[in-house]
């Protein structure tokens, strides 16, 4: 039947998981790592990355909200006068992977929601800026993998 919805593709962070609660602590931790615990430099890095210092929130199109670990490493390494972008990228990827799984805060009972949607015959997918491995690990940790037809990280 034309016009029938057959599938739903969800964005992970900010839709299924509380973006701020999940990622603000991770972003601050890598800023501390990069800045060597220099409070002024940490604040500068967070501002460069897209955090509003007045609200503590991240601009939706900022590197911290929508960029890759590589983009963030390039930005912050340049601001710190560092030349270890490749090493920072590896560190950020590993940190985000661990933190994203451990600290993700679902906005509702996601397995129940996804189960109801599957019961209606819908195909379900997730899209995220996370790495593919981190996306899969988060879906597995929250019991969503059996419900998903597609995960794109």
Map each language-model feature to its residues.
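N-terminal helical cap/lid subdomain that shapes the substrate entry/recognition surface
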Residues: 4-120
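Substrate-recognition "cap/lid" segment bordering the active-site pocket of phosphatases
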Residues: 103-105, 112, 125-153
């Amino acid at each position: 039947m034309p016009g029938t919805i057959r599938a739903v593709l969800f964005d992970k962070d900010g839709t299924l998981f509380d973006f701020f609660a999940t990622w603000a602590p991770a972003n601050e931790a890598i800023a501390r790592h990069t800045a060597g615990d220099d409070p002024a430099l940490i604040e500068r890095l967070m501002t460069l990355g897209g955090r509003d210092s007045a609200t503590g929130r991240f601009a939706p199109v900022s590197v911290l909200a929508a960029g890759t670990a590589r983009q963030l490493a390039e930005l912050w390494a340049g601001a710190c006068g560092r030349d270890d972008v490749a090493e920072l990228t590896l560190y950020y990827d590993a940190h985000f992977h661990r933190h994203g799984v451990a600290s993700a805060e679902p906005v509702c009972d996601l397995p129940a929601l996804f189960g109801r949607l599957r019961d209606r015959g819908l195909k379900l997918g997730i899209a995220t800026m996370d790495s593919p491995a981190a996306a899969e690990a988060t879906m597995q940790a929250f019991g969503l993998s059996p419900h998903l037809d597609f995960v794109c990280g």
